[in-house]
Curated annotation (Swiss-Prot):
Beta-D-fructose 2,6-bisphosphate binds at residues 505, 563-567, 601, 608-610, 664, 690, 696-699, 771. ATP binds at residues 55, 118-119, 148-151. Disulfide bonds: none annotated. One of its GO terms (molecular function) is 6-phosphofructokinase activity. Mg(2+) binds at residue 149. It catalyses: beta-D-fructose 6-phosphate + ATP = beta-D-fructose 1,6-bisphosphate + ADP + H(+). PANTHER family: ATP-DEPENDENT 6-PHOSPHOFRUCTOKINASE (PTHR13697:SF4), PHOSPHOFRUCTOKINASE (PTHR13697). Substrate binds at residues 194-196, 231, 238-240, 294, 322, 328-331. It is found in: Cytoplasm. The gene is pfk-1.1. It comes from Caenorhabditis elegans. One of its GO terms (biological process) is canonical glycolysis. This is ATP-dependent 6-phosphofructokinase 1. The keyword Metal-binding applies. Residues 1-420 are annotated as: N-terminal catalytic PFK domain 1.
């Protein structure tokens, strides 16, 4: 037995451990209702209550709004329980019936408008008896709990005790038997609201993305002063015993060192840290950023604080070192577009999950898996979360990282590779070969473009490749504008928007292709990464289709979609679109605020996106807009006239403003000016109309953490894939000849997977005239937009969503 065990390699042991974890502790999701027809009043006469508990997080208000309005639309009576479990115990004015207007204009607010608290009394039986009394007296038997694992565990304990609690209340005449009979059991659906992202079973928790944005904006600000004085900064971030925020912030900010609980530092961490910082300075870097999770520890379980790190750097290297503890600023401020959208989607799904439950149903949590709304068992998720805590208590760090999920593992692996200064001669993917690889940007600039190039360059250097950047797109390629990269050349690229390589929209033509081929041959380019929008995708098709004529194009090629329009087939999300939606939401928030004090004003906001309505739809949903006009959903003058009636009816009941988002090419005749003129004419003295054309500001300044990290990880994945193809298509005389369709691919997110799709296969899914994919997942969100905004809608969806039965992969980019 011992002899057999000794033959197992660490890799095999790792595989066995992962397989066992998946087998015995897998969390099996159930498909949600998103994208299906939503009929009004289908749950008429039913009652539910919403409460937020534990620490607050940005995006909770979005969830409260979504649950309230979807439930009212479906015919339910909705109660809001103020101050969490404390309010449930106190009763009285702490439990109020909600109306449609109760949750108006809250989607952009941080925190939670219904308050949150940590209740010690609810942990006692008497506290739970009081809470049960208040719920029974109001006929509440369905609860939506928005909080962390502690709040959700408490809710489940309450559910399990319900029968005994009710019997005791009836026996002691605290409630009537008739009232108790109406609520024989309670059902619970959870939404995880936590900035820590420490809950197993969901890829993202509500508030995490906003916290990351706050952290990254703070680090970006610190970088400027650190460079000026050649300082080292130690940044402490929240997260309790989960290192997610610290790890992802380190990736997005290009931090030099990161301390997290799941990957403890060795005993000699002071020497390792100082050697790394010294090495970075010797490469010409003027500053150092070190990120410390508040729960950071060493291998012995001893805490590592920001002050410990500062002392080590100051004593050993004599650097001017400062500590910045971000604290509760990470919880504050307006929620990001991602968290607003997540709250909307999860909240709507929670209503359907709750209403479809029976007495035998187990409580569930609404989760996002890849880009799909699913329902997962609450108890299984809590159990898995507790397993992480146990693994860390047992100092089983490998298991702790595995239990955090594939995304966490991928983040950690990528961070380790991208922060290495010395590349390995052996055990790399090149396997002794010296490949020449190149990267080019094509199309309009977008957030995350530089992050992708940085990641590709450093991963290529790590794997012993010579890597070139091609400047100014195909014009630069034709002119031989090549730059050979060193490791330090791409320092601080991730935090910057635009394109440092330069990018243009021109495509390869019959006239330029001989020049392109000649330059590829001259520099012996053996693999090419294209980072860009629809032009990058179209260019790859052109190059692949001309391989017979130009052998120089017979190399592995890969496209990473990077465009704010999100109009490239083969992926659900493009790099840059998250940055753009956040920019739009921030501007809409200011536009809405400008109406404060004025009466009856209608705003028309025009977004970019070409013919694609992605930006218009998602920014409308994320900002609480009333409608979005897009090309994919044709509209007529009659539709606009009907909207005027909606505007008038809303203003008659107290609304002071109405906001419409219009995609720039939604209709060639019904232009933004036309819509304004029609509204002005029909509205007459009832309201005034103003137009805001947002323009190129939507391309963003600093990329969001989402776009930085998605660009980083997609480029790393693309380089690995290209190296595999290089080795597969290498001839005996060390030439690369790649002719198959599978060597010209697009790397995208499809449902819950990251997929390489041959670009020639995507042609049939493409409307080249309008530069659109034939199927767009986000059209499934259009019904939700109308329900949450109008309170009257007949909706149906033809959007196609991916099956949740597919095996999960590292499709989420955080």
């Amino acid at each position: 037995m011992d002899a057999d065990a000794s033959t197992i390699t660490p890799e095999e042991l790792d595989f066995i451990r992962q397989r066992a974890l998946r087998r015995f502790d897998s969390i099996v999701p159930t498909a949600g209702r998103e994208g299906t027809e939503i009929a009004s009043d289908i749950f008429k006469g039913r009652t539910l209550a919403i409460y937020t508990s534990g620490g607050d997080s940005q995006g909770m208000n979005s969830a409260v709004r979504s649950i309230t309005r979807m439930a009212i639309y479906c015919g339910c009576k909705v109660y809001l329980i103020y101050e969490g479990y404390e309010g449930m115990i106190e009763g009285g004015d702490f439990i109020k019936e909600a109306t449609w207007n109760t949750v108006s204009d809250i989607i952009q607010q941080g925190g939670t408008i219904i308050g949150s608290a940590r209740s010690s009394e609810f942990r006692t039986r008497e506290g739970r008896l009081k809470a049960a009394t208040n719920l029974i007296n109001r006929g509440i038997g369905r609860l939506v709990c928005i909080g962390g694992d502690g709040s959700l565990t408490g809710a489940n304990t309450f559910r399990l005790e319900w029968t005994d609690l009710v019997q005791e209340l009836v026996k002691n005449q605290r409630v009537t038997a008739a009232a108790a009979k109406k609520i024989p059991y309670i059902q619970i659906v959870g939404l995880v609201g936590s900035i820590d992202n420490d809950f197993c079973g969901t890829d993202m928790t509500i508030g995490t993305d906003s916290a990351l944005q706050r952290i990254i904006s703070s680090i970006d600000a610190v970088v400027a002063t650190a460079q000026s004085h050649q300082r080292a900064f130690v940044i402490e971030v929240m997260g309790r015993h989960c290192g997610y925020l610290a790890l992802v912030a380190a990736l997005a900010s290009e931090a030099d060192f990161c301390f997290i609980p799941e990957w403890p530092a060795p005993e000699n961490w002071r020497d390792v840290l100082c050697d790394k910082l010294s090495q970075m300075r010797s490469e010409g870097q003027r500053l150092n950023i070190i990120i410390v999770a508040e729960g950071a520890i060493d291998r012995d379980g001893k805490a590592i604080t920001a002050e410990d790190v500062k002392t080590a750097v100051k004593e050993k290297l004599k650097y001017d070192t400062r500590v910045t503890i971000l604290g509760h600023v990470q919880r504050g401020g307006a929620p990001s577009a991602f968290d607003r959208l997540l709250g909307c989607r999860m909240g709507a799904e929670a209503v359907f999950a709750l209403m479809e439950m029976t007495e035998e149903s187990e409580p569930c949590v609404i989760s996002i898996d890849g880009n799909v709304m699913v329902r997962v068992p609450l108890l299984k998720c809590v159990e898995r979360t507790q397993m992480v805590q146990k693994a860390m208590a047992d100092k089983d760090w490998t298991t702790a990282v595995m239990l955090r999920g594939r995304s966490f593992q991928r983040n950690l692996e990528t961070y380790k590779l991208l922060t290495k200064m010395r590349t390995v001669e052996k055990d790399n993917l090149s396997e002794g070969h010296k490949f020449n690889v190149a990267v080019i940007n094509v199309g309009a600039p977008a957030g995350g473009m530089n992050a992708a190039v940085r990641s590709y360059v450093r991963m290529a250097l790590y794997h012993q490749c010579t890597v070139y950047g091609i400047e100014d797109s195909f014009e630069g390629l034709a002119n031989g504008s090549f730059k050979q990269f060193k490791w330090s050349d791409v320092t601080n690229w991730a935090m910057n928007g635009g394109s440092f390589l330069g990018t243009q929209k021109s495509l390869p033509t019959e006239k330029t292709m001989p020049q392109l081929a000649a330059q590829l041959k001259k520099h012996n380019i053996q693999a090419l990464l294209l980072v860009g929008g629809f032009e990058a995708y179209h260019s790859t098709i052109i190059l692949a289709e001309n391989r017979e004529k130009y052998p120089e194009f017979c190399i592995p090629m890969c496209v990473i979609p990077c465009t704010i329009s999100n109009n490239v087939p083969g992926t659900m999300v493009s790099l840059g679109s998250d940055t753009a939606i956040n920019e739009i939401c921030q501007m809409i928030d200011k536009i809405k605020q400008s109406a404060t004090g004025t009466k009856r004003r209608v705003f028309i906001v025009e977004t970019m996106g070409g013919y694609c309505g992605y930006l218009a739809t998602l920014s409308a949903l994320s900002s609480g807009a009333d409608n979005a006009y897009i090309f994919e959903e044709p509209f007529t003058v009659q539709d606009l006239s009907d909207d005027v009636d909606v505007i008038l009816s809303k203003m008659e009941v107290g609304a002071k403003r109405y906001l419409v988002v219009r995609n720039e090419w939604a209709d060639k005749n019904l232009t933004t000016d036309f819509v304004q003129n029609l509204f002005d004419s029909e509205g007459k003295k009832n309201f005034t109309t103003r137009v805001n054309v947002l323009g190129h500001v939507q391309q963003g300044g600093s990329p969001t953490p989402f776009d930085r990290n998605m660009g980083t990880k997609l480029a790393a994945r693309a380089l690995e894939f290209l190296l595999i193809q290089l080795k597969e298509n290498l001839t005996a005389d060390n030439k690369v000849i790649a002719k198959s369709a599978h060597t010209a691919t697009l790397l995208g997110l499809k449902g819950r997977k990251v997929v390489f799709t041959p670009v020639q296969d995507l042609k049939k899914e493409t409307d080249f005239e309008h530069r659109l994919p034939s199927e767009q997942w986000w059209m499934a969100l259009r019904p939700l937009l109308r329900v949450l905004a109008r309170h009257r809608s007949t909706v149906e969806s033809s959007a196609i969503l991916e099956s949740v039965e597919e095996e999960s992969a590292d499709s989420h980019m955080f």
